[in-house]
Amino acid sequence: MPKSKRHSLSKFRNWVAYLIPLGLLVLAIALQAVAPPVLTQLQLMVFDEYQSLKPRVKTPLPVQVVDIDEESLAQLGQWPWPRNELARLVDVVSESGAAAVVIDVLLSEPDRLSPDVLGRMLPDWPEYQAAREVILDRVSHDELLAQSLSRANSVLGFALDDDHHDEIPRMKAGLVKAGDPPDAFLPYFGGSISALPVLAEAANGYGAISLVPDADGVVRRASMLVSVAGHILPTLDAEALRVAQSASTYIVKSTNASGQQSFGSSGGVVGVKIGALSVPTDSQGRIWVRYADQISQPISAWRLLSGDFDPAALAGKIVLLGSSAAGLSRPQPTPVLGVAPALEIRAQILETLISGEFLYQPDWAKGAEILSLVLLGLLLIWLLPRLGALWCALIGLVAIGTAIGGSWILFAQYNALISPIYFAFVIVLIYLTQSLQVYLASEKEKQEVRGAFGRYL
């Protein structure tokens, strides 16, 4: 082969050797920008591990769980309890000076044990007429509970359900919007399952009781506001904070509000102000739950009804009334506690909000990762044919170690969530691809040299 032709072929091979890793780098950056589900899941797994390694330190906070636990069911009978018993519970909590009593149980059906229901079940015979009139004269259990709710700083819940289309729940507070309309950014649900109207009207607060997990079923984030059939409504957690502060309005701040920059072309929610508390959120109006690895210390519900408790344990606190009993607990997976009852998860959400220990993903994180990938990727592609695999391996390892260490420090010291996993994967992939290209090119040159010597000999 003529020398000039061999030189041209060698240059072409060199260009091809660069194009393959460059193509991989471009593809990796495009995937990072699009954020496919598998990449998102890898990042979430890293964040879960960080939370497990450094959970929130449990400190005294004004949140108290009152648990309708197995012991309470053994003492007072199986669920559902008559609503007059729930009314007594609400009264005891309120009279103990609680800042708010939050019912973490969906009460969507009338009490089947109420006198009015039982009275209507009696046969319409003359011998039952007197008994029927006496029973129907009594106040219904639902009305008794409604009276208790109206006397207390109470919060009741409705369930989010795309397949149910009850009347849209009425928001109990005002809503002020600053910046872009938040409706398009909030989690959307087609419908809801409402609480019994007489109870919903009596409560001071009314919010979505449902916990919304990520695609893998793990509850990592909690919404402050949701969109139900196009109507913005608060969650139970947001309402608990509002009622506890006797606040009357939510202020939701989105991009393009005064002093706020857009996350990009789609914009997003920046934060929600609830009374005196400013809650920084992600673009969908959610917070990351900062889990502690210690569960809350509940008070068994039967102790409140029997008077066997210290009222000071409830005074000035947000009291969550729910159940951890089997069949009632609505358990869901969490990053730190394993599978936990919804009641415990709700307590952790409120503790996160009150403690102010908010996890967040910095706006600049994605841009910084792309820039780092471009710079280090190009550097490795250029250096590998010149310095060799060993030196470039050291450079790559130092860069990956720095990314992992920096990510951990940002989490541990500043509560920032930045995953190094994709950066590390792409750098290793580019290193291996370019190393293979260099090796194959070197072997090709050796074959050509041996072939040339063979012709001379």
Task: Outline where the language-model segments fall.
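Hydrophobic residues in alpha-helical segments
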Residues: 304-305, 353-354, 411-412, 440
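Active-site Gly/Thr loop motif
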Residues: 278-300
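Non-transmembrane functional regions of envelope-associated proteins
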Residues: 2-277, 311-391, 395
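Surface-exposed ligand/attachment interfaces on beta-rich extracellular proteins
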Residues: 303-311
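Regulatory cytosolic signal-relay segments
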Residues: 423-457
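Transmembrane alpha-helical segments that form the functional core of multipass membrane systems
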Residues: 359, 363-437
